[in-house]
Amino acid sequence: MLKLLLGDPNARKLKRYSPIVSDINLLEEDISPLSDDELRSRTSDLRQRLFNAGDLHNQIPILDELLPEAFSIVREASKRVLGMRHFDVQLIGGMVLHEGQIAEMKTGEGKTLVATLPSYLNALTGRGVHVVTVNDYLARRDAEWMGQVHRFLGLSVGLIQQDMRPEERRRNYACDITYATNSELGFDYLRDNMAADISEVVQREFQFCVIDEVDSILIDEARTPLIISGQVEREQEKYQQAAQLAASLERSAEMGKDGIDPEGDYEVDEKQRSCTLTDEGFAKAEQTLGVQDLFDPQDPWAHYITNALKAKELFVKDVNYIVRDDEAVIVDEFTGRVMPGRRWSDGQHQAIEAKESLQIQPETQTLASITYQNFFLLYPRLAGMTGTAKTEEVEFEKTYKLQTTIVPTNRIRARQDWADQVYKTEVAKWRAVANETADIHKKARPVLVGTTSVEKSELLSSLLTEQDIPHNLLNAKPENVERESEIVAQAGRAGAVTIATNMAGRGTDIILGGNSDYMARLKLREVLLSRLVKPEDGPLPSLPVQDSATASGFSEASATVAPRVSASLYPCELSGPTDQLLAQLARDLVKAWGDRALSVLDLEERIATAAEKAPTDDAQIQSLREAIAFVRGEYDAVVKEEEARVRDAGGLHVIGTERHESRRVDNQLRGRAGRQGDPGSTRFFLSLGDNLLRIFGGERVAGLMNAFRVEEDMPIESGMLTRSLEGAQKKVETYYYDIRKQVFEYDEVMNNQRRAVYSERRRVLDGRALKKQVIGYGERTMNEIVEAYVNPDLPPEEWDLDQLVGKVKEFIYLLEDLTPAQVNGLGMDELKAFLQEQLRNAYDLKEGQIDQQRPGLMREAERFFILQQIDTLWREHLQAMDALRESVGLRGYGQKDPLIEYKNEGYDMFLEMMTNMRRNVIYSMFMFQPAAPQNQN
């Protein structure tokens, strides 16, 4: 009703952008005739106009004025370099991002191209722009692909990758536009704030940031803080004993209807993801371990047992992690990708290693940490884009102060979303999924089946194999993950069946009829590999084979031989002239680059460069480009015909096999079908055994099914059921939002402390007025000593001046001649002023002694001792704050707000830490005795 009265707020926003789009389109007439050099020179003109405006605060309104011209320049450059012209809706997306909002743009609408608009405009300030993606591959792809537009216009483009050295990182962060992943940005920020010297700092001050897949980073990953840790030794036997104990304990059944707790050793709360020992469990554990108290601080066991129970019940092999090379490797619950190098903290990973009888790695201690929420709030201007943001609109607004605008699609959506089907049992559900896949496959339509775990994907694979349906399997197993983009690029071909674990998070579009461009690049790689790649470059996986009934696996092939590619992967045989062209190209490239002289990565990068449209003077890249065009041309003829057949048959059909806890992730999976106005359809198959229904309200549905005596293989389709499911999802979303909100509120306390510590550290690294800073520490320490030993309410003759003078001498041994008589008769303020003057004199004397050894040594010592104390005490403080956070939770039972308790006590602990830091620095500076330089004779 409100929307009818006031109008759609999203439509009102979009209406505001229409005149600016018209301005950009009018400018196109002036921009198009310009030569490349004239177009490039416009960047310098725009920069000069910004420079004249002065500081950043004054530049923002000027940026808004420059927007139509800047966007028009980028659109023209993109047309020339990439052969892609921004649609009007993409211009709107660019404006939404420039204004610091979230642009919701559906799959296939060209979000990557949209980011070039605000990143160019904001890079004109010279203060740097960060474009953030979810993985290294996408960061590299976008930097190479979209970076061509920026480089063409005279801007520098940087890329941050996981294995880069600090000097490379510094160089890339100094560029006008830098592409990076969220984790690399966050870890570099933490490392910069642990640097021992300013030369080790790689980032510069943050300015403007555009996040691709913003919901994945700011929502899905918001519960997990970024942590840099160091190893600490713990007793490995305890993990093993706890794992054995957990295996012997019995889980309690659900709470009885009469409220009586059923028998069992421990209870599991899947909603809270926690395990709790019952009284019987405590007794059994203490007896088995031969201890009297599991919580004994001298010999603690409770933490180990809780983690072992969670490893047993809540961390499932091939769902939450896989075992590879005798290691437990985490599987990302949102993307289905493995995350090598990542470990669960707080001893949980060690508990899983003990459960799987793997070698137990040392536990870690936090050295520095920050949540993504507080990290991205460090940017003065933040924006993001995704296909699915509206369901999380409230959280974006409340946590990040980011509004969400839905950008209309360029073409009207033609996708059909069929009603969910719910089955009584999982067995019946999976049989139905296999049957629908077979039916759609027979119609020569491509099918994409999304599963939630490796185990489920392999179950479906075996069911399809029984029906002789050829299919590709894409999950976190190492043998499947290597060729992800090849599988996805061909998932739109007629009759293709692809099973993907957590497809929602994968960045490659599915093109109906197949991706001829990718196939052409693959063919070039196959032809050139055996001639150009060095033999010792290691084994290569072979490529997916789609004509067998089993899931396409990958076997190793020697690097000296082209990978074995099934002929069915390519749409047709190449003509004789094209084959000859490729053979001649191979000979020419061997002459230019050497016989088997490249690595696989080198070859792939050169083919990728040739496949783009950027201008190049490199003769070999030009030859490669011509060859790709020839091969693509032949494939295109077949692919276009196949695309027409797939369209007529109904397009891609997407099957979801379980509702995710978040509606947004379901929408991402649905969004794979019907991109850019293509036809397509989607359906979800569910069962009462699915996690969402089981944990959040399946009893009601089960009751309905039993009441109507529904057969196992008989599905239910009803609007009431769908609404019930969406209600359950909203419950889960609210539950997780509350968790993220709590994480944010608690980390906000740490964030204020972190900022204070890091700004103090940065001042020291910059070497700004170090002596003044240390003397300031000393003066405050003198004041604290006076306040500790002098009571202003007592007469001066009762003040304990002996103790006071003794304490001053403990800190400053150079004042050993100071006596109580010298301070007798002074008032409190006079006493403080006298001691501060004594401190300054003593410090000057100390500086003279130290700098006699080597000029400038005193400044080096100041920097060293301040950083040493900050880092040591901050590390201890992080541990203490973690312990405090765990303990304040129990105070809720005493009618106290745990968050307020945490804030108050945390603040007191922080003040104590800063006081200790100042005192330790003063003590260390006066005790510092550098070794005398040795006689060189």
Swiss-Prot record:
It is found in: Cell inner membrane; Cellular thylakoid membrane; Cytoplasm. SMART domains: SecA_DEAD, SecA_PP_bind. It catalyses: ATP + H2O + cellular proteinSide 1 = ADP + phosphate + cellular proteinSide 2. InterPro entries: Helicase_ATP-bd, P-loop_NTPase, SecA, SecA_CS, SecA_DEAD, SecA_motor_DEAD, SecA_preprotein_X-link_dom, SecA_SF2_C. PROSITE patterns: SECA, SECA_MOTOR_DEAD. ATP binds at residues 90, 108-112, 509. Keywords: ATP-binding, Cell inner membrane, Cell membrane, Cytoplasm, Membrane, Nucleotide-binding, Protein transport, Thylakoid, Translocase, Translocation, Transport. The keyword Lyase does not apply. Belongs to the SecA family. Part of the Sec protein translocase complex. Interacts with the SecYEG preprotein conducting channel. Has a central role in coupling the hydrolysis of ATP to the transfer of proteins into and across the cell membrane, serving as an ATP-driven molecular motor driving the stepwise translocation of polypeptide chains across the membrane. PANTHER family: CHLOROPLAST PROTEIN-TRANSPORTING ATPASE (PTHR30612:SF0), SECA INNER MEMBRANE COMPONENT OF SEC PROTEIN SECRETION SYSTEM (PTHR30612). This is Protein translocase subunit SecA.
